């Protein structure tokens, strides 16, 4: 009778309801199973009015300019906005609606992600040497707003969810929340190749997140990768009819995670557990201790790989070994029970993983009309 079955769907209720019972009893009401009074009549759920709307806006705009040869300046702006609204009414003909004498609810949420990215990309070739350098800055803003209202004990089902004030509930439920977080990044990347044979890439990122306290907001994450396309060497030229591609790769990189929400160092809640006279009064309480030294979770990974292609790409083999360590794991930590507030978000430890992966792709049939690839 708590409303879960009304919201779970007709099929769930139909699977659990006694099929020997008629749809309606002798009084014209929906029949109920006396042995399972918590199960609603599945046909009665058709009387529920449930309307959900969703609006989503995905937009992106960019500007490019080439002030000199080889230099590209680009500004990119994007938005991802998702708005949802749910309106529901459980009439007195349903099990839960009858117990609540009609129950109405409205909820709406607005989730937005704004992005600005500015980059400068420079490419230069000097003989057999190719250089590409990129520097940039990005800024992201995440916002979320939610509102909900519920009421019950209506004199008639005719209002549906259009007049919550018509309900005679002793304590109508009203809720709202809002969150905002920001991410700023500065990054750079340098690519170098020599004769398309030796390859080197180095990157550096500095990411700042408002999810952490002011002294711990910035994390620095470097990476470097080197490659050798050995099939371009002259001493392997006689084998190119068989070994069409061969590349050895080695890389090391660091990435960061700040996904802890925006309340990791300041978290309060509102509860109605304060009794004054015959009334319960809302109050604010600390539900989670703040952590001013909380910092980025960092993943460090080594990777060694070998790519081989045979018979003009008809057979391709990739072998990789990786070793990954994730340190300063972000997680909720339970404190000793005698603390009045016994929860805190902390950097709790680290994990380690390693493994070997082997992938083989073969193109068994390839012509202008059809191709077949097996893996």
Residue ranges and their predicted role:
Residues 24-26, 30:
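Charged, amphipathic alpha-helical segments characteristic of ABC-type P-loop ATPases involved
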Residues 1-12, 31-90, 99-375:
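Extracellular/periplasmic, surface-exposed regions of secreted and cell-surface proteins
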Residues 16-24:
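Phosphate-binding loop that captures ATP/GTP phosphates
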């Amino acid at each position: 009778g708590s409303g879960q079955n009304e919201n779970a769907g007709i099929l769930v209720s139909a699977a659990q309801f006694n099929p020997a019972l008629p749809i309606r009893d002798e009084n014209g009401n929906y029949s109920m199973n006396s042995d399972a009074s918590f199960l609603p009549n599945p046909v009665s759920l058709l009387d529920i009015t449930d309307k959900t709307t969703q609006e989503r806006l995905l937009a992106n705009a960019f500007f490019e300019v080439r002030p000199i040869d080889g230099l590209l300046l680009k500004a990119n702006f994007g938005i991802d906005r998702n708005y949802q609204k749910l309106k529901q009414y459980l009439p007195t003909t349903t099990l839960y609606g009858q117990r609540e004498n009609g129950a109405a609810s409205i909820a709406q949420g607005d989730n937005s992600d704004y992005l600005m990215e500015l980059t400068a990309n420079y490419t230069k070739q000097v003989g057999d040497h190719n250089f590409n350098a990129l520097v940039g800055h990005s800024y992201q803003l995440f916002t979320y707003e939610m509102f909900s209202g519920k009421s019950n004990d209506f004199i008639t089902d005719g209002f549906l969810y259009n007049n919550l004030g018509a309900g005679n509930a002793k304590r109508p439920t009203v809720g709202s929340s809002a969150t905002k977080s920001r991410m700023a990044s500065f990054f750079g990347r340098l690519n170098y190749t020599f004769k398309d044979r030796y390859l080197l890439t180095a990157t550096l990122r500095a990411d700042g997140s408002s999810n952490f306290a002011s002294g711990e907001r910035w994390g620095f994450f470097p990476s470097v990768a080197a490659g050798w396309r050995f099939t371009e060497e002259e001493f392997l030229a006689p084998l190119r009819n068989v070994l069409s591609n061969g590349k050895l790769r080695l890389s090391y990189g660091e990435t960061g995670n700040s996904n802890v929400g925006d309340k990791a160092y300041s978290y309060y809640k509102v509860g109605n557990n304060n009794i004054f006279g015959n009334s319960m009064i809302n109050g604010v309480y600390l539900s989670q201790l703040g952590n001013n030294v909380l910092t980025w979770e960092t993943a460090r990974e080594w990777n060694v790989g070998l790519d081989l292609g045979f018979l003009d790409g008809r057979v391709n083999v990739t072998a990789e070994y990786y070793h990954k360590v994730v340190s300063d794991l972000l997680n909720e930590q339970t404190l000793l029970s005698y603390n009045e507030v016994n929860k805190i978000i902390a950097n709790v430890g680290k994990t380690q993983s390693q493994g070997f992966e082997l992938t083989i792709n073969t193109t068994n049939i390839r012509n202008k009309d059809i191709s077949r690839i097996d893996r």
